[in-house]
A protein has these predicted regions:
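N-terminal pre-domain/capping segments
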Residues: 1-78, 82, 86-101, 290-295
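Active-site acidic/histidine proton-transfer and metal-coordination neighborhood
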Residues: 68, 84-188
Length: 295
């Protein structure tokens, strides 16, 4: 395991991880508390199936309990099946509806964000795929807002891809363009960025990447998916490793944190045990500047 070398400073990034909900949302809250999470991500339904999220009997307890242990933001991850950029009208419509339903379901749990993959143009061309993605995001939000009424609606965040095949939004420029046109913000996955061509294998590279994020995305950057990369630079192959066990330099993390102040970070790294996972959270907090959050 890596040890932080950065000089302690006031930490502004809230640190969390993706947690399972299979044992119930009360268990999710317990794990979050035991691991010292300050933000959390979860699925509101089976990410590999089109089934509509079922009402959660423990939703009220979660909505009450998350603020009590200062989980902020609460993040949901949308289904992997969603492809708003698909050239297939049937798949696209199903994706729009699925995202709308998940926005409403996430809102019922008090979630602030729903991360959705940017999808693929499936060989129909990047320009057309990006246009469909923008329209799909706008339509899904409108459908969800109509269903949710006056209640506060979770905000969709579009995520960068690894750039494999016909995937969209592997570059920050395209990600920013889509986000601006759709009126949404973004989630940047560090592992995706590295394998897509943004070099995080050195601290110098991390400084440049953070600079690019600042100039292209600015305030639209709402969340980091903090994952080490299983595969190398420009490999365009997805795969997450625990922090310090992949291809991203151990000295890159402090460079990102100091240049992206206030951006919450959620790990989607492999589970080991609750105790080992808690130690990983502690490590990342130190890499981000120190254990206590700045007031």
């Amino acid at each position: 395991m890596i040890e932080p070398k950065a000089k302690p400073r006031a930490r502004t990034n809230r640190i969390g991880r993706h947690l399972p909900t299979s044992g119930g949302l009360k268990k999710t809250l317990r794990l979050a508390r035991e691991q010292g999470l300050e933000t959390v991500q979860l699925f509101v339904s089976n990410p590999q199936a089109w089934a509509v999220p079922a009402p959660r009997p423990d939703a009220e307890a979660f909505v009450k309990g998350a603020p009590e242990i200062e989980l902020n933001p609460v993040v949901a991850h949308a289904k992997y099946l969603i492809n708003l950029a698909s050239p297939s009208p049937e798949h696209r419509e199903r994706s729009v509806y699925a995202l709308a339903v998940e926005l409403v379901a996430a809102s019922s749990l008090g979630a602030h964000f729903v991360v959705v993959h940017s999808g693929s143009h499936v060989g129909s061309g990047e320009e057309g795929g990006a246009e469909r993605l923008v329209k799909g995001l706008i339509r899904a939000r409108r459908l969800a807002a109509a269903e949710n009424g006056a209640a506060e609606l979770a905000e969709p965040l579009i995520e960068n891809s690894v750039g494999a095949g016909t995937q969209l939004c592997s570059t920050f420029d395209i990600l920013a363009e889509v986000a601006e046109k759709a009126g949404v913000r973004v989630c940047v996955d560090t592992a995706h960025a590295h394998v897509a061509g943004y070099d995080l294998s050195t601290p110098e590279g991390a400084r440049k990447v953070a600079g690019r994020l600042g100039t292209t995305l600015g305030d639209r950057l709402a969340l980091l998916h903090l994952n080490d990369a299983r595969n190398g630079l420009k490999s365009h192959r997805d795969g997450h490793e625990r922090i310090g066990e992949g291809c991203i330099s151990e000295e890159a993390w402090p460079e990102l944190f100091v240049r992206l102040p206030g951006v919450p970070a959620v790990m989607e790294t492999p589970y080991v045990t609750p105790e080992v996972d808690a130690e990983q959270v502690r490590l990342v907090k130190e890499l981000a500047g120190g254990l206590p959050l700045a007031p």
